[in-house]
């Protein structure tokens, strides 16, 4: 008997979601890589697995696997999908859930319009928490590239590592070439997601993201949060920022640097299926 799955997406950032509460699921790295292939598999940016939690106060364990099979600690778009998945399939009747990932806890609230608000926690800037190999914390870091040039960027953790670069025009930004170099740079020992941010006005930014283990995706929830946090901290943007990604818009609210940052956006069901092998 095969494993049932549901295809979902958040602004085009697409997933297969697996119910590990009612099914026993043990996928290998190679199996995930095969399933992620858009020509010979299902095709997705991440594989999401929801499991029962034995910890008081935590409703579910939320596990995230990139297309390369690597388990990671954060995915904001996936979190919104997990919330709707859990309620739709009767795993919970609650509209507010707490889930645990590999690295963090997340509070998820299903709103009346079926959008989901995600408490992404308090962003962290200390190099050791990102992680980034640097002598001290700084607003901006300089990385030497393969060709001998340097690039200046911000670095932040939203439960997973992010680099954010300010650009004049995201349409012409070298997202794949430069994004890959930065993502695999040895100063980021766990690799890094790379956001290319264009400030539109006091309340809006445009963003493209190169995700570690995936390449460029048309939406990245944690990347949107990382960019909005950097914009608020270092470029004096509003406490409520609209992040425009190729897949659509996300709303980020951050009242102050010591408060949790909140991501709100949609999630959608696409189809159900069964993994046969």
UniProtKB/Swiss-Prot annotation:
Keywords: Amino-acid biosynthesis, Cytoplasm, Isomerase, Lysine biosynthesis. It comes from the Bacteria. The keyword Cytoplasm applies. Substrate binds at residues 13, 46, 66, 76-77, 160, 193, 211-212, 221-222. Pfam families: DAP_epimerase. It catalyses: (2S,6S)-2,6-diaminopimelate = meso-2,6-diaminopimelate. It is found in: Cytoplasm. The active site is at residues 75, 220. The record marks 162, 211 as: Could be important to modulate the pK values of the two catalytic cysteine residues. GO terms for cellular component: cytosol. Its EC number is 5.1.1.7. The record marks 271 as: Important for dimerization. One of its GO terms (biological process) is lysine biosynthetic process via diaminopimelate. The keyword Cytoplasm applies. Pathway: Amino-acid biosynthesis; L-lysine biosynthesis via DAP pathway; DL-2,6-diaminopimelate from LL-2,6-diaminopimelate: step 1/1. GO terms for molecular function: diaminopimelate epimerase activity. NCBIfam families: DapF. Homodimer. Belongs to the diaminopimelate epimerase family. This is Diaminopimelate epimerase. It comes from Legionella pneumophila (strain Paris). The gene is dapF.
């Amino acid at each position: 008997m095969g494993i049932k799955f549901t295809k979902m997406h958040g602004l085009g950032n697409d997933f297969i979601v697996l119910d590990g509460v009612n099914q026993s699921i043990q996928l290998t790295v190679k199996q995930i890589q095969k399933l992620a292939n858009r020509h010979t598999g299902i095709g997705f940016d991440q594989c999401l697995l929801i499991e029962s939690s034995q910890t008081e106060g935590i409703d579910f364990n939320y596990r995230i696997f990139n297309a390369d099979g690597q388990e990671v600690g954060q995915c904001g778009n996936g979190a919104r999908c997990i919330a709707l998945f859990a309620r739709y399939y009767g795993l919970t009747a609650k509209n507010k859930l707490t889930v645990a990932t590999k690295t963090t806890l997340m509070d998820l609230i299903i709103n009346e319009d079926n959008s989901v608000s995600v408490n992404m926690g308090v962003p962290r800037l200390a190099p050791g928490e990102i992680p980034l190999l640097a002598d001290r914390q700084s607003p901006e870091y300089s990385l030497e590239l393969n060709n001998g040039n340097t690039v200046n960027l911000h670095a932040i953790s939203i439960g997973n590592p992010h680099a954010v670069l300010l650009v004049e025009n995201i349409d012409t930004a070298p997202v794949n070439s430069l994004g890959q170099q930065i993502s695999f740079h040895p100063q980021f020992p766990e690799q890094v997601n790379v956001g290319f941010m264009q400030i539109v006005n006091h309340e809006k930014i445009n963003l493209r993201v190169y995700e570690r283990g995936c390449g460029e995706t048309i939406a990245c929830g944690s990347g949107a949060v990382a960019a909005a946090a950097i914009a608020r901290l270092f470029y004096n943007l509003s406490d409520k920022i609209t992040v425009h990604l190729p897949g659509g818009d996300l709303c980020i609210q951050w009242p102050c640097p010591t408060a949790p940052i909140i991501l709100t956006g949609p999630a959608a069901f696409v189809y159900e299926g069964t993994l046969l092998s």
